[in-house]
Amino acid sequence: MVREALQFLSRLRKSSNLPDPFTCNKHIHQLINSNCGILSLKFLAYLVSRGYTPHRSSFNSVVSFVCKLGQVKFAEDIVHSMPRFGCEPDVISYNSLIDGHCRNGDIRSASLVLESLRASHGFICKPDIVSFNSLFNGFSKMKMLDEVFVYMGVMLKCCSPNVVTYSTWIDTFCKSGELQLALKSFHSMKRDALSPNVVTFTCLIDGYCKAGDLEVAVSLYKEMRRVRMSLNVVTYTALIDGFCKKGEMQRAEEMYSRMVEDRVEPNSLVYTTIIDGFFQRGDSDNAMKFLAKMLNQGMRLDITAYGVIISGLCGNGKLKEATEIVEDMEKSDLVPDMVIFTTMMNAYFKSGRMKAAVNMYHKLIERGFEPDVVALSTMIDGIAKNGQLHEAIVYFCIEKANDVMYTVLIDALCKEGDFIEVERLFSKISEAGLVPDKFMYTSWIAGLCKQGNLVDAFKLKTRMVQEGLLLDLLAYTTLIYGLASKGLMVEARQVFDEMLNSGISPDSAVFDLLIRAYEKEGNMAAASDLLLDMQRRGLVTAVSDADCSKQCGNEVNCS
């Protein structure tokens, strides 16, 4: 096709005759469809320079191509120049511009193009359903729900929605978490005598799967089968992902089997989703079984698949296998990304292999990566937990530090009892424009309680409340522990009651803490009361019921 177009251009240069519009359009389309769009642009420019007046569709083909390249400003210049060559732009010309702006994420410019058509009152041309569908698609990608509602009303004054319109609305509503609106649009579509297609169903199924409402998703899937609609790989992927996220791996496998039976070829994303699902359930064997299936299909692992497998193996305590996968990845000429490097660092630290973790960090730098906040936080946390706090501080970077990194370092310093450095870091947080959060305060309070410095711990609690931060279960438990350790049981019980009044439900740990403290001071009645309260809440205690009853002299039935 390209050769034919080039031969035509060669003959044209030797001839004084200009081509007819049909021949010109044919060759421009051939060049664009053969990925020679730049050549088609030069071809059109040559014809114009010869005084030829191209047909509008020739310009439109080139405009569409230029927009898909992302060069929408250049495409606009072409559209605006069309009248100079005796050719008026039509709605197709402007639709390409709207679509181009939306592809670039420039929704405002896309809206302005459509509004210019409306404002012309048909003098230029009227927007059609494609104009609105392109704009709605742009809104959908940017999750601009309010704009969808505005332009719904505008569109209905010009034209009626079609299947594409409804599908786009449904997709937007699902992405915005408005599932009831999505389902309502689905039913409205049917009332308008429009039949939902595979895209419509898939958008809705994906929305319900992501919301965790699998039964509605499955009912839609069954409706698709009932009307004998062919499901595609995207539909199956949405369902499989929904089952995996819920941990329903048997149903995920059944859907995979149905997919194969329907002769829909599973792609890399399907396999990666199932592999991740099994790893999340702690089932490494089945995860590796599906990895073998994936490789037997002749699929090459991409960076995402490698990341899922490495993370899954590390999370299931299979560091040796994860290391082998990283080596296999590098042999395949794929460079691990920042996430994989950080995952491996974290796994090495957790297994006590600090040297290997630090080596992985240096390897990350050697590969040209600049450590991000997650990588630096992992380093600080890992080194500090391995008892080398001062070395960890070396990796602290004020320029990159966020609340997570500050929390990690403050927690480590508090465990070491270095409260002077903690105080200094708190001042740095404010200078950096960050606000200390409850996790930072809780770590500080815990450190002070551990040292028995209850006065400063409660001062910090007051400061925390003054800054509008609510204490959580961990903060209250820490304070109760500090008071109980000092034998201040009246005060400990007051903090416990304050926690209950604030609406926080106690866990087994805080009950056990108080019960043991009461037993230690011989207040068995108070211990028994707490044990009964704990049992009423359905919590399991490490304190023996029999011991409690015995020590109470059987005054209270604790069973």
UniProtKB/Swiss-Prot annotation:
Keywords: Repeat
Family annotation (Pfam families): PPR_1, PPR_2
InterPro entries: Pentatricopeptide_rpt, TPR-like_helical_dom_sf
Position of the signal peptide: none
Gene3D superfamilies in UniProt: Tetratricopeptide repeat domain (1.25.40.10)
PPR repeat spans: 20-54, 55-89, 90-120, 128-158, 162-196, 197-231, 232-266, 267-301, 302-336, 337-371, 372-396, 402-436, 437-471, 472-506, 507-541
Family: Belongs to the PPR family. P subfamily.
Name recorded for this polypeptide: Pentatricopeptide repeat-containing protein At2g01740
Protein source organism: Arabidopsis thaliana
Source lineage: Eukaryota, Viridiplantae, Streptophyta, Embryophyta, Tracheophyta
